[in-house]
Amino acid sequence: IIEYHGTLFAAWYNCEEKELIGPTPIRQKRSKDGGKTWSDIETVAEDQTGKILFCPPVYGICEDKLYMLINEMVSADHIHALDLYVFQEEKDCFEFLWSKPIPFKLNTNVYKMANGKLLLPGRIAELDGFPNTPAVLISDSGKIDDDWRLVYIQENGDLPDGSKLVHPEITAIIEDNKIAMFSRDDERKVPLVYLSQDYGETWSDAFSYDIPFSDSKIYAGTLSDGRN
């Protein structure tokens, strides 16, 4: 979900049978009254053959343009491509820009950092493989439709105690050059946090923390009054 020019945009992957089985079109609604009422459903991307699964949609705003990034998958969580769409206000719809063979699983909206660069948290795999390694994409130009550079948060999906990361879905709190990146940890069911002091270029080892949390998605954010 994101706010753009006074409108809330909310998008999801619509599993018509069960999660990531069969067609998974990306659908969207809009609200012009702060979420009290919503528009009819719009379809942004779909493959009715079910050969390509879409998941998940995330948003970003750059140079006053609204973008949506979507993963293509060949099976559940096996990443085939990263797709980019831009919202055309004059046409009142999203239009496809490009698709690149980047096996990076999205999780959060685009973050703009204090150094002008953009950050996308997620997890990486081999092409058409399962992403079990936390990583970030960085846009050095600060533009969403430009090249993105991959930075590993850790070398692979192995933890020091011998357990393995399964779905290391990550989310960030950013303050100037400092980033706290929170990660799901399925096997131990103890959430992890990684720290960066240089805008996501290098990362600490994983720490455990005491926020009650299980093996499910986690999202962080900063409110308008500065609270995280």
Question: What are the functions of these language-model segments?
Answer:
Residues P56-P57:
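Charged, often glycine-rich, active-site loop that binds/positions anionic groups
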